[in-house]
Amino acid sequence: MARQATKLIANLSKKLSSSNPHTRCSEQTVWIGAAPPAVFVDKNTRVICQGITGKNGTFHTEQAIEYGTKMVGGVTPKKGGTEHLGLPVFNTVEEAKAETKANASVIYVPPPFAAAAIMEGLEAELDLIVCITEGIPQHDMVRVKAALKKQSRTRLIGPNCPGIIKPGECKIGIMPGYIHKPGRIGIVSRSGTLTYEAVFQTTAVGLGQSTCVGIGGDPFNGTNFVDCLEKFIADPQTEGIVLIGEIGGTAEEDAAALIKESGTQKPVVAFIAGLTAPPGRRMGHAGAIVSGGKGTAQDKIKALKEAGVTVCESPAKIGVSMLEVFKQRGLV
């Protein structure tokens, strides 16, 4: 089965690369009766679940429906034509999109087949794909990343992430919905559990969240800090930003550069995990490793502070730090 999945990825990658990029890039989503979401999702987002009949797909689809997310169908090969949780099940993403008018997908598919599921969503030209799966082979994700760069229609969030939520409107992923409260803070994080910590704290101090995005901890992901920060900076509902990073890579340094260049007046509070991590040892996530003298917490903290970001020494201080900055600037 794993060989079949790898073969499918290769075939789809070739097909994507052979298509006319100018034609693909010029296509625009038509949002009937509503503007496109400020930060990837809103109450109008129509979601299908790839892997809906599996244990994880079933549980989290139930949770999403209870939260109020517009779940419109699911995809499980060879189970097309059936129903699950009261939703129609299709054999392919293309069929599901045609029948349900879905514009987003969430993936709960085992690691050997997850990359093929992402590529299927790309082929169907969905606006958003959220991949929760952890442990996807890096070789598979390199091919997915290459395919993503050849088009501009579809955005991938993840893999190995908790997902994305706009409190009170749309929950796509595994995060606990009840800790979120509609509000003023945009949160972007490489860590799932630290995202929940930041959410709980910003809710506790009365600020709430505009949108929360878990970008995942793998080396090859679809959406990075810069992508999210650009959206948060432009979003009128987002008045402050929380950024949670970790050792490894240069994503946090890139984020610091954008914050500096943008000249945004929105307060940014950050926490970087892994300050005491030894070089060369992976800390939890596949991308959380200091190698070649790069990716240290100290470098990231320095870059963020130089960009005017308030950097917390402890994740327990994220909420109170943001509230203090809001008070200093007369925002509360």
From Swiss-Prot:
Pfam families: CoA_binding (PF02629), Ligase_CoA (PF00549). It catalyses: succinate + ATP + CoA = succinyl-CoA + ADP + phosphate. It is found in: Mitochondrion. Its main location: mitochondrion. Its EC number is 6.2.1.5. SMART domains: CoA_binding (SM00881). The active site is at 285 (tele-phosphohistidine intermediate). The keyword NAD does not apply. Residues 1-23 form a transit peptide. The keyword Calcium does not apply. CoA binds at residues 53-56, 79, 132-134. GO terms for cellular component: mitochondrion; succinate-CoA ligase complex (ADP-forming). Keywords: Ligase, Mitochondrion, Nucleotide-binding, Transit peptide, Tricarboxylic acid cycle. Expressed in roots, stems, flowers, leaves and fruits. GO terms for biological process: succinate metabolic process; succinyl-CoA metabolic process; tricarboxylic acid cycle. It is an enzyme of class 6 (ligase). GO terms for molecular function: nucleotide binding; succinate-CoA ligase (ADP-forming) activity; succinate-CoA ligase (GDP-forming) activity. Substrate binds at residue 196. Disulfide bonds: none annotated. It comes from the Eukaryota. Heterodimer of an alpha and a beta subunit. Belongs to the succinate/malate CoA ligase alpha subunit family. Succinyl-CoA synthetase functions in the citric acid cycle (TCA), coupling the hydrolysis of succinyl-CoA to the synthesis of ATP and thus represents the only step of substrate-level phosphorylation in the TCA. The alpha subunit of the enzyme binds the substrates coenzyme A and phosphate, while succinate binding and nucleotide specificity is provided by the beta subunit. HAMAP family: Succ_CoA_alpha. This is Succinate--CoA ligase [ADP-forming] subunit alpha-1, mitochondrial. It comes from Solanum lycopersicum.
